[in-house]
């Protein structure tokens, strides 16, 4: 069994500036942490210098069980139906979200599990029934992430792209979709009639054992308005490299949108963690990954991001394709020593409206271990948790 380095790292705390929290931050001192599992090949680094691997159930099982051991609160998988190509064949190889998370629900016991529904591909009544099934498998630990779909070739290859006017109507579509879901989960029946869906005494039973959580990742005004009305929380991108609070205006917009509906909808922020013993060592990793950027795959991403001419400049895909840090789709990136990353995550927790983070790693298995043993014990916003060492195999 590997012993924890917590004692040595704790000696470093005094040298690292810490935040002063106010009394209202008691909830934030328990900031939620999730793992964005690598359902697609190579995770979230579009680089020939990054670890190259295929997505498998066994890999994701090991990741989520390790995350559960270190008291991560949730695991989320995306859905991707066509990749970016290039030398790395980035995201050309993907598992399916609901079936993967059903399997992971069966081999975990505490961690919350979220699958993503590509709503153009799955009727809401089928999603309602699949979700109720995974609720049964997990003992009430399951929820659904709803996405409208932005990458036209994913759907065009199957002949189900509804036309480019969908870009401007996609949240109208999603609004009807979630209303059908809520009917079926809440009452077991739906007679909803709308522009996109017509239910005729549609039935789903058994219903979920607990209220089913719905999450979304709206960053546009329309997306945030949807989340404010229907989601339990909203994902947003972190921004920049080692600028942990740069997303604050996005969280503020989400809070403002939620105030209009009288609901409490917090922001969960997406970050990549690249950590090492020292700041310099971590920075060297990051520079190495950037130097190997797969330009062909990145060109595909840029091309697809330009096809939505109906939405504004504030959509997720616009940020993903920004050339600044496109090598990891421009998610917020925290690069540094274990103590530095812990400090930056505490800064994330200080932002009003930030209720959690969704983390990716350059190397998931070792990254979760070092996070659990070297980073999390230094975080004020996770101080309620016990210090753990690596689990015995």
From Swiss-Prot:
For molecular function, the Gene Ontology terms on record are: alkanesulfonate monooxygenase activity; uracil oxygenase activity
**Record keywords:** Flavoprotein, FMN, Monooxygenase, NADP, Oxidoreductase
Q: Where does this protein hold FMN? A: 79-80, 145, 154, 170-171, 220
Q: Which InterPro entries match?
A: Luciferase-like_dom (IPR011251), Luciferase-like_sf (IPR036661), Pyrimidine_monooxygenase_RutA (IPR019914), SsuD_RutA_monooxygenase (IPR050172)
The UniProt record describes its induction as: Up-regulated by the nitrogen regulatory protein C (NtrC also called GlnG) and repressed by RutR.
EC number(s) reported in the record: 1.14.99.46
Domain of life from the UniProt record: Bacteria
**Gene3D superfamilies referenced in this protein's UniProt entry, alphabetically:** Luciferase-like domain (3.20.20.30)
EC class of this enzyme? Answer: oxidoreductase
One Pfam family it belongs to = Bac_luciferase
Reactions the enzyme catalyzes: uracil + FMNH2 + NADH + O2 = (Z)-3-ureidoacrylate + FMN + NAD(+) + H2O + H(+); thymine + FMNH2 + NADH + O2 = (Z)-2-methylureidoacrylate + FMN + NAD(+) + H2O + H(+)
Task: Name a biological process GO annotation.
Answer: nitrogen utilization
Query: According to its UniProt record, which protein family does this protein belong to?
Result: Belongs to the NtaA/SnaA/DszA monooxygenase family. RutA subfamily.
Describe its function.
The FMN-N(5)-oxide reacts spontaneously with NADH to produce FMN. Requires the flavin reductase RutF to regenerate FMN in vivo.
By what name is this protein known? Pyrimidine monooxygenase RutA
Q: What organism does the record attribute this protein to?
A: Escherichia coli O9:H4 (strain HS)
């Amino acid at each position: 069994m590997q012993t924890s380095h917590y004692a040595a790292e704790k000696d470093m705390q005094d040298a690292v500036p810490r935040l002063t929290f106010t009394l209202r931050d008691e909830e934030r001192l328990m900031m939620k942490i999730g793992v964005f599992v690598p359902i697609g090949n190579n995770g979230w680094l579009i680089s020939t210098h990054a670890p190259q691997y295929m997505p498998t159930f066994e890999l994701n099982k090991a990741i989520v069980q390790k995350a559960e051991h270190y008291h991560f609160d949730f695991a989320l998988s995306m859905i991707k139906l066509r990749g970016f190509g290039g030398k790395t064949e980035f995201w050309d190889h993907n598992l399916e979200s609901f079936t993967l998370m059903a399997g992971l629900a069966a081999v975990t016991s505490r961690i919350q599990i979220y699958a993503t529904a590509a709503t153009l591909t799955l009727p809401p009544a089928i999603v309602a029934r699949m979700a109720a099934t995974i609720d049964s498998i997990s003992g009430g630990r399951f929820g659904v992430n709803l996405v409208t779909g932005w990458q036209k070739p994913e759907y065009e290859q199957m002949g189900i792209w509804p036309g480019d006017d969908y870009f401007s109507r996609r949240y109208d579509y999603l609004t009807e979709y979630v209303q059908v879901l809520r009917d079926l989960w809440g009452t077991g029946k739906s007679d909803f009639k709308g522009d996109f869906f017509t239910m005729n005494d549609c039935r789903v039973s058994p219903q979920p054992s607990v209220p089913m959580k719905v999450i979304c990742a709206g960053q546009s005004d329309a997306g945030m308005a949807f989340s404010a009305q229907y989601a339990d929380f909203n994902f947003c991108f972190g921004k920049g490299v080692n600028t942990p609070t740069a997303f604050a205006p996005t969280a503020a917009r989400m809070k403002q949108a939620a105030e209009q509906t009288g609901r409490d909808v917090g922001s969960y922020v997406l970050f990549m963690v690249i950590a090492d013993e020292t700041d310099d060592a971590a920075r060297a990793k990051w520079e190495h990954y950037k130097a190997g950027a797969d330009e062909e795959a990145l060109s595909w991403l840029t091309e697809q991001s330009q096809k939505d001419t109906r939405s504004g400049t504030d959509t997720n895909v616009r940020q993903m394709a920004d050339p600044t840090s496109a090598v990891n789709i421009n998610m917020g990136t925290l690069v540094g020593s274990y103590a530095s990353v812990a400090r930056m995550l505490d800064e994330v927790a200080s932002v009003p409206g930030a209720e959690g983070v969704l983390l990716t790693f350059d190397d998931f298995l070792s990254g979760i271990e070092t996070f659990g043993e070297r980073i999390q014990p230094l975080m004020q916003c996770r101080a309620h948790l016990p210090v753990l060492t690596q689990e015995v195999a």
